[in-house]
Regions:
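A beta-rich soluble binding module of mature secreted/lumenal proteins
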Residues: 2-191
Length: 191
């Protein structure tokens, strides 16, 4: 038990230093998008807001999903870094259980780590998507959340609706940060 406390405390310090959303307690069991249809979900999504993460340090974030095989979606995440370079990572998202197709596990080609949860809580497929992920680490949980749009902007009404869903799930939307999607600033992403 003492070893678990030391590991948990060490993890807490590391994650706090890297701006991860580490919270006390186990991951909640949240409802996901009913009748999720991955064929309608594929395509390009713009990141509007996110919980800060160690692995996303840029702006102009996009996620492009493509069909690979039944239950598997190709993933291409891109972002513009402060130095003007474009950072990207390639992976795949797999449906964890066929009975819950909105619960996917994402793994990336260049990262030797276990797959991470990617749960679609809400999406109309045409304008918005709300994604949540959570992993348990002993006494703590590590949370991720993204508000995505098919366009670089999102209406205030839709944004508030997505934030309300997160709030009802126990995720503080005030901890989220906006992603710069300014057309001029993000122009290098279109080259």
């Amino acid at each position: 038990m003492k070893a678990m406390q030391v590991i948990s405390l060490t993890l807490l310090c590391v994650m706090a230093a890297s701006a991860q959303m580490l919270r006390f307690g186990k991951c909640p069991k949240l409802p996901v998008q009913a009748n999720f249809d991955s064929s309608r979900y594929v395509g390009k999504w713009y990141e509007i807001m996110k919980l800060p993460t160690q692995f996303q340090k840029g702006e102009c974030g996009t996620a492009t999903y493509s069909p690979k095989s039944p239950g598997v979606i190709g993933v291409l995440n891109r972002e513009l870094l402060k130095d003007g370079s474009i950072n990207f990572i390639v992976g795949s998202a797999k449906v964890k259980h066929p009975s819950e197709p909105a619960k996917l596990e994402v793994s990336f080609t260049d990262i030797p780590s276990p797959p991470g949860p990617y749960w679609v809580l809400s999406s109309d497929y045409e304008t918005h998507s709300l994604v949540y992920g959570c992993s348990d680490f002993g006494l703590f949980r590590l949370e991720f959340a993204w508000i995505l749009s098919r366009e670089p902007t999102m209406s205030e009404e839709t944004l508030q609706s997505m934030q309300s869903i997160l709030s009802a799930a126990g995720v503080n939307p005030e901890k989220m940060v906006a992603t710069n999607q300014d057309e001029t600033y993000c122009a290098p992403m279109n080259q």
